[in-house]
Each structure stands twice: as C-alpha cells, then as structure tokens.
C-alpha cells in the first residue's frame, strides 16, 4: 500500500527541492516505498542536508532490489518514449502534404472570390464607395448589423472613453465598492438608455420591476424556475409580436410619446435583458439554498485560481445576500458596456466585480487586447472591400452561379459572419474591461479551427453557451438527458434570436446533426486503440467524420442565415448534378485536410502543456 506523502511531516522547515526529489524517487519505485518506514527513520530531523544523504544512499543502490526495479522502469519509460516519438514523427510527416494543400486551397479561394466579385458587382445590393481609392473596390455594407455598428463606431468610441474615465475617477477618489459603483452605473447607464430608446425606457423599467418583484416573492418556492421562465418567455414573444408596443394602446393621450422612441429599437436589445433577468432570478434562488460548488476542489483543479487570480467560475458562484438589491439589479440589467450586444455575464460575477475590479487582465493586457481589435477591424475592412460575400447572399445572385462558386460564397459568408460578431463582441468586452468588469470571451477559437458541432457552439457565442449550460442544460438534467435537452435549448436559442421560421429550421437541423455526433462521440470516448494501426484508423475516421460535420454545419448555417428552408432542395439539387458532384467531393477532401490540420494544432497545444 502506497503511503500518503501529503501527510508526512518533514520537520518544521519548508520542504527543499532535494526533499521533493526524494519523495518523487520513492513514489516511482515500489521497492523503496515498501522500505519507507526505514528510510524515514533516518536521523535527519527533516533537514535538506540529511535528505540529500538519503537520496545519495538510494541512488548508490544501497537498498536491495532497487537496481533491478530501476532498470525495468527505465526500459518501460524508454519504450514508451520511443513509441511517442515515432507517433509524433509520423503525424508531423502529414504536414508535408497538409500545409501545401491548405496554401493552394486558400490561394484558389481568394483568387476565385476576387474574380466573381469583380464580374458581378454591378448586380449586387449594398455596395458603397470605399476608402481604397479605386472605384473598382467598393465596400460591402449590405449587412445591416455591421453597417450600423461601423457607422456608429466614432460616437461609440467617444462614449467608451468617457465612461471608462468616469468609472476610474469615481472608484479612485470615492473608494466606491459594490453599492457605490452600482449607483454610479445605474445613473450613467440610464442616461445612455435615454439616448438609445427615449421614452421606451418606460417599457424596460416596467418589465424589469415586475421581474424583480416575482423573484423576491417566489424565489423560495420549488416551482419558482417554472414561473421565471414563463414570465420571461411571455415578454420575449410579446415584445417581438407587437414590435416594442405603441404608447397609443394605453390611450390617445399617451400617443405623443411615440414621437420620442430614441435611435435604437428597445425590444431588440431587450433580448439580452431577458437573459440577465433570468440570471438574477436563478442566482438569487440558489443563494437561498446551499452552495452547489466545492470551492476547495475547484481551486485545486483551476489553473487561474492556482496562480492567485480569481476565475469566472468562482465569481459567478459568489452568493452575497447584500448584492441582491433593486439598485444592483437595475445596474446589472442596464450596464452600458454590455447592454447592446453582450457578452453575457451572470449576476453574481457582475456584482462581485463591482465590489473588487477584475485582476485577470493588467493595464498592458487590456491595451494589447484593444490593439489586436484594431488589427482585426482593418482585416474586416480589407475583406469587405475585396470580397462581396454577404452582398451575393442578400441579392440572391448566388443562385446564378456554378456549384463551385456557390460553395465559395457560402464559405465566405460564414467567415464574414464570424469576423463581424468577433469584432462587435470584442469591442464591447474591451469597453467592459476598461471599466473593471471581465465578461466571458466570445469567439475564443477561430471558426476554421472547429471540427465538430460541440466545439463550434462552445467557441461561437461562448458567453451565451455558458449561460445556457448554467441556467438551462444543468437544470434540465445535464448530460443524463442530453439527447432531449438539445431540442429545448436550440429551440429557445432560435426564438431568442428572432421569430422566424428559417431560424427554427436552423435550430432543428442543428439538433438533427448534433444527435448522431453525440452518440458517435460517446462511443469514441469509450474506445481505446491498442495498436498503432488502430490509432491510425481511429484518427482517419475522426478526420472523415469532422469533414462531414463541417459540411452539415455549413448547410445548417446557410439555411438559418442565407437561403432559408425553401432553398435547401435547390441547394441539394445543385450539388447532385454532373457539375456539382466533383465540387462536393473536393469540398469533403478539403474539410478532411482542414480537420487533420486542426488535430495537428491540438497536438501541438498538448505538447506545450
């Protein structure tokens, strides 16, 4: 039986490196472990010098049986290391084929994209004169969301700088903690909302107040989660159906307020407020119960917590009863940096960081974060000036193209969407970091580095994924009911985005593709290849499965955001033709190569760790 070294007392001095080495040596060899009492009885009083003497005795083979066992262990280690090296060499050898293929693939995609954009630009909607100077290079601003964000960027940047400076001054000179900062953010965010929504702020405050009363009255009841969901889904649907309501429905003497509805539709932003209201309700409900997280066990496993910093998981599990006030609640719902587009942060995590500002990012880190955003923005500008992917999708001109060009446009649209959301979400997260509140990072991984649906959704709207896991997936039964939960979760995600049939179709298509992946992944996790050939075949099958998954993911997203359900049959018929089948095969081969490259990236990360 192995001794528990964590309970061994090495005198009153701090353990030296030599002492640690002795313990590791004893742990590695059972013959030493069986003689542990004799070794520990050495008259050393726990000093490093005496431990050095014991280690010398051990390494000089004065303990019987040590040399034989050491030789056997060394042989086993050498054999394992040799196999690992051979495996790494064979996998690295793949790069000789994979990297040139990827380079040729992207050169071809870029050249063909330039060609079709140049040939059809006169038929496309949403192109505007750009800043490259040549009339040949127009800017694709056909996406309304990107166009609005881009045009409002100067005024947003002024507001960002002003709010960040005021927050810093207020906290520094008034030494404000959670209560003071909540008052500050409530006041300044309310002014921000008056500019955005005008008189419609009345609707926001009314619904938020009703939700607060519901939480405070029923949070101790077992049926509270059901009430919370019914209330919030009811208003989510009503806001969309009635398009934010008209003041005239309350009487003609209120109709004049419809002339003061602000510059931004309030019911669009309110989708994020719905998520925050549910978060507040659940966090308060759980605060009245016992803690659900073993903090000591978490700290032992979490690398962020081990480094002396506080991770997001700990922040969102901090239940401080004094934080659940109406002022803190409203400041959380209306917090200006994250109000328009997120990222989504839980109530507990927000309240904790008003008390003590985030320490994960230093001033230098935040500055570098902002600089990287500027580089990414310039990349987006270059992309929209050269490639008109979204304009093809909006104009419907893609239906006139060949199957190869349809694939290129579809692939380009997904990359455009990824970069668009990447820039929007990181801009507002940068603003929040400047103000001392860290929200989860959306888009932590590139779109082209996700070879399965689970990885894709964890790394797309990542903060929303964390929210769904915490407030839907786990309460609905977690992994035990995973095959059923996915339908409820993705249907909610579709309805939350908008009341459109094509989004419902996207959600259900995603579920249909998700379920086989979950079944296969569950079987793959329990499979252990015993031979080199077995590992090779398993890796090849995984790469092929990744290629199919990426293809399904493209189809689901094109249905949801571009062609709609009615375009599925047309798309399938296009690729079943004599011209389309070679494109389909080439697409699968390209995605297979891409998946193998993703495996190489993951292997490199594991080696670094």
What are these model-predicted stretches?
Residues 2-31, 35-609:
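Non-catalytic, membrane-anchoring transmembrane segments at the edges
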